[in-house]
């Protein structure tokens, strides 16, 4: 374990004293460091009447138990403090370590000992081996009582709210859209968990089309075949119009108003970051949206109709929209329990809706936590004029996702009444996505949130993985860079795949979010400042660093070679079929120079930290009137790399007081032969730009530019890079087995590494 402490807020000695005393630690400004430390440690043993016995079982040094040390006249030193601090944080001498000084240094222990009360204050805010901070662990053990009121420590809310006595209620918010065109504004189901208190509370809202269930069997039937020809597209220029995000003014007329919800629930799937803050006094709201189980309308999959329906929930929390107690629309109900301040949460589609909601500029949305979210749906299902499936899901497209999330049809009565109209709508959508050509068009433009980044007012927190080939890093990169310069924004860029990071051992992500939420939603003047970019170092285990930005302008140019080289697109039928059945076998062969590709290896002559988009400038020609080029950059070498999927440790991360416990996790540092750094794909007809389609003349040289997926990746002098240039990608692109070649003039081609 390594300590990477970004949530701790430095305080004055007076504040440290006051906060320690308020929690029941009997420290004194007049007592010695040793006396205060003894009092602190004895308080730690909440379940012991005889704390002498507990102290006897801990050590102050290899020859002295802790009780004997406290009874002696020896002063408290950095070495004793460090050894005891390790035991307080759950580390076991002679098991986890033998040399405490070396162990503390290796773990980057964040506390510089000076004997002050600030040391004890910071120790409480430090992560234990089990994943909770020491203060959260003690509160879960009833250090302080449940009060159903806010208690803050170091600018963060503690788990003082009763999660056994929550309000669990359902309302149906009236949206400004009628997506199924039945003449009624669509209602969306809102599931609410909130503390049982008599004062207004803020809310964490998760907009998830998956929340009420999914229609997987129907979606599977729509999965597209990836085998087929790459079509020649007519040359031309694509024209677009800017979408309008305008909703009619809401009707706020009350109808037989009531103050209590009619509908309750016993259980719903939850998001653990929401659970964590629910125990700390922030309501938790889940909204599936239009076209889902027990909501109304059709699933419009990423357009602003869907977004405005979610926005209506934030409007309702602020008195700007109506909600009903049931879909019969007989009684309206207000959110009289809500302060109106909201943060959105969630990963993938959930993070996507966070991005989209932020671009509405809705009042009340104070903070957005967008984890691995899409910022432009074209960049999820397409790339540079090509069909490019999200990693791991070849054959999926927006129509299959629409069917997957249209859970309204799981209610037989709804199916009976609406399926015919829905199928007509789905057919229109399937045509509009244009799988035939793969081009950007008005349909995709209507689902591009980046163009409205200037409207974002909320503080934005992104998390994204360098190995996320599902929602690729271009999505966070372009949104992060498009936000107004004056806006507060933050990015946690890790080395994982499409994964949550709020229960990772190596970083205090959820505690950082606690501090930021208290500042933005509870108006707590805690002085907290989160760095702009927090990056997980790819070269070592559990190491995080602060960077100034994502995307740099400097570039190191690498000439690709001195001769021409060709890529054969065609495979023998047996190999083509094998790769189609198991795309991982294709990737294995590709990376080890066993597939149809140009494989180029380079040894770096300097240290470099890639930050941005690797750019390829290629001089190419195709033997036919079409073609695509794919590229991947890898670090080669048999050594340890961070694996993309976190390993689960123990089920001991407590999100309250024995509430919604989850598994601690971390990216393992494992031996491997290579690591993918970045990748990209381009239709040769889109070589100029996304909106220009040009003819490809057989055997005529063209100069193309290809920006690969953005990343941050550190390399040392002597490290080996491998650039692989190929055509068909069996994981991502259309599988065209036509017999043609793409030739690259390596002497006129180069790769630029941004740093």
From Swiss-Prot:
Compartments in which it is found: Cytoplasm
Major subcellular location class: cytoplasm
One Gene Ontology molecular-function label: aminopeptidase activity
Entry's EC annotation: 3.4.14.11
This protein's record includes keyword Hydrolase: yes
GO cellular component terms given for this protein: cytoplasm
Catalytic activity from the UniProt record: Hydrolyzes Xaa-Pro-|- bonds to release unblocked, N-terminal dipeptides from substrates including Ala-Pro-|-p-nitroanilide and (sequentially) Tyr-Pro-|-Phe-Pro-|-Gly-Pro-|-Ile
Keywords, ordered alphabetically: Aminopeptidase, Cytoplasm, Hydrolase, Protease, Serine protease
Entries under InterPro entries matching the protein: AB_hydrolase_fold, Galactose-bd-like_sf, Pept_S15_Xpro, PepX_N_dom, PepX_N_dom_sf, Xaa-Pro-like_dom, Xaa-Pro_dipept_C
Subunit-level organization: Homodimer.
Protein name according to UniProt: Xaa-Pro dipeptidyl-peptidase
Origin species: Streptococcus thermophilus (strain ATCC BAA-491 / LMD-9)
Primary gene name: pepX
């Amino acid at each position: 374990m390594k300590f990477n402490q970004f949530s701790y807020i430095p305080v004055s000695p007076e504040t440290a004293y006051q906060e320690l005393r308020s929690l029941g630690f009997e420290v004194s400004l007049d007592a010695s460091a040793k006396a205060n430390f003894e009092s602190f440690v004895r308080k730690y043993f909440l379940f012991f009447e005889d704390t002498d016995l507990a102290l006897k079982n801990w050590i102050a040094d290899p020859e002295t138990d802790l009780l004997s040390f406290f009874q002696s006249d020896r002063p408290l030193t950095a070495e004793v403090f460090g050894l005891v601090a390790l035991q307080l944080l759950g580390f076991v001498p002679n098991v986890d370590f033998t040399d405490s000084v070396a162990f503390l240094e290796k773990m980057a222990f964040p506390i510089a000992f000076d004997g002050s009360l600030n040391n004890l204050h910071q120790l409480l805010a430090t992560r234990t081996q089990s994943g909770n901070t020491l203060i959260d662990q003690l509160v879960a053990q009833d250090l302080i009582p449940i009060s159903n009121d806010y208690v803050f420590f170091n600018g963060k809310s503690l788990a003082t709210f009763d999660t056994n006595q929550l309000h669990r209620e359902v309302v149906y918010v009236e949206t400004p859209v009628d997506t199924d065109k039945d003449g009624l504004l669509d209602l969306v189901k809102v599931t609410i968990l909130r503390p049982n208190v008599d004062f207004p509370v803020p809310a964490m809202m998760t907009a998830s089309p998956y929340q009420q269930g999914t229609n997987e069997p129907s979606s599977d039937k729509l999965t597209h075949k990836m085998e087929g020809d790459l079509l020649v597209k007519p040359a031309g220029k694509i024209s677009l119009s800017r979408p309008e995000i305008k909703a009619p003014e809401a009707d706020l007329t009350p109808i037989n108003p009531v103050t209590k919800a009619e509908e309750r629930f016993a259980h719903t799937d939850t998001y653990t970051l929401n659970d964590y803050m629910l125990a700390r006094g922030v309501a938790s709201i889940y909204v599936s949206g239009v076209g889902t189980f027990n909501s109304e309308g059709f699933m419009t999959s990423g357009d602003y109709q869907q977004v405005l329906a979610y926005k209506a929930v934030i409007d309702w929390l602020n008195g700007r929209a109506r909600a009903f107690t049931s879909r019969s629309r007989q009684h309206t109900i207000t959110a009289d329990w809500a302060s109106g301040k909201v943060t959105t949460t969630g990963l993938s589609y959930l993070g996507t809706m966070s991005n989209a909601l932020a671009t509405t500029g809705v009042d009340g949305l104070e903070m957005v936590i967008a984890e691995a979210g899409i910022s432009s749906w074209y960049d999820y299902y397409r790339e540079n004029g090509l069909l490019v499936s999200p990693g791991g899901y070849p054959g999926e497209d927006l129509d299959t996702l629409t069917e997957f999330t249209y859970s309204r049809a799981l209610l037989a009565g709804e199916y009976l009444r609406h399926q015919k109209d829905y199928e007509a709508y789905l057919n229109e959508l399937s045509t509009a996505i244009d799988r035939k050509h793969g081009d950007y068009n008005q349909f995709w433009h209507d689902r591009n949130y980046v163009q409205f980044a200037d409207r974002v007012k909320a503080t934005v927190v992104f998390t994204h993985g360098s190995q996320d080939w599902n929602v690729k890093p271009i999505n966070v990169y372009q949104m992060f860079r498009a936000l107004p310069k004056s806006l507060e924004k933050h990015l946690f860029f890790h080395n994982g795949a499409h994964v949550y990071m709020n229960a990772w051992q190596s970083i205090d992500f959820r505690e950082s979010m606690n501090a930021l939420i208290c500042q933005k939603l509870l108006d707590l003047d805690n002085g907290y400042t989160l760095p702009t970019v927090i990056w997980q170092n790819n070269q070592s285990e559990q190491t995080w660093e602060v960077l100034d930005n994502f995307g740099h302008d400097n570039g190191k140019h690498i000439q690709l070679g001195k001769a021409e080289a060709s890529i054969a697109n065609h495979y023998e039928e047996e190999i083509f079929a094998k790769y189609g059945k198991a795309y991982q076998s294709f990737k294995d062969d590709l990376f080890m120079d066993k597939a149809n590709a140009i494989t180029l290896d380079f040894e770096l002559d300097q240290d470099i930290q890639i930050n941005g988009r690797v750019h390829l400038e290629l001089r190419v020609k195709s033997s036919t009137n079409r073609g695509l080029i794919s590229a991947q950059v890898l670090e080669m070498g048999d050594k340890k790399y961070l694996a993309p999927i976190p390993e689960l440790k123990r089920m001991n991360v407590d999100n309250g007081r024995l509430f919604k416990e989850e598994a601690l996790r971390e990216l393992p540092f494992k031996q491997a032969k290579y690591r993918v750094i970045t990748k990209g794909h381009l239709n040769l007809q889109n070589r100029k730009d996304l909106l220009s389609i040009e003819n490809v003349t057989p055997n005529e040289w063209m100069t193309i530019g290809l920006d690969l997926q953005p990343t941050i990746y550190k390399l040392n002098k002597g490290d080996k890079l491998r650039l692989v240039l190929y055509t068909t990608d069996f994981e991502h692109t259309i599988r065209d087995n036509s017999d043609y070649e793409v030739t690259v003039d390596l002497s006129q081609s180069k790769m630029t590494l941004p740093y």
